[in-house]
């Protein structure tokens, strides 16, 4: 929940990026406020997650593509963590992809 803003070596929630809504909420204003460039760190994270998440998809689900569960970290871990009732949520990649789509809708950048 804290990402890079944590000051403690033993952070609450391990200072993970919670991608089942918390991280996304930080970027909701990016396009509607005409600050598209502020989306770039999130897009970099999505690019990284596509790499680590492809291994996770293959190992856990014998699937092509990539998957991210509800949390990730600086190493872009994608597997389920913490309690099963919320950790087994393989929709993080889909939620993050909404930001890619919103960026395209607002900018019309076909090369993106």
List each model region and its residues.
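Substrate-binding groove/exosite segments of carbohydrate-active enzymes
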Residues: 1-112
């Amino acid at each position: 929940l804290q990402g890079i803003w944590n000051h403690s070596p033993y952070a609450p929630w391990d200072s993970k990026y919670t991608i089942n809504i918390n991280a996304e909420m930080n970027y909701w204003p990016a396009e509607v406020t005409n600050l598209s460039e502020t989306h770039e760190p999130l897009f970099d994270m999505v690019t990284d997650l596509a790499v680590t998440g492809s291994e996770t998809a293959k190992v856990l689900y014998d699937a092509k593509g990539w998957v991210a569960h509800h949390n990730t970290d600086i190493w872009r871990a994608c597997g389920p963590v913490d309690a099963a009732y919320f950790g087994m949520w393989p929709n993080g990649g889909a939620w993050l992809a909404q930001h890619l789509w919103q960026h395209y809708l607002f900018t019309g950048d076909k090369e993106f």
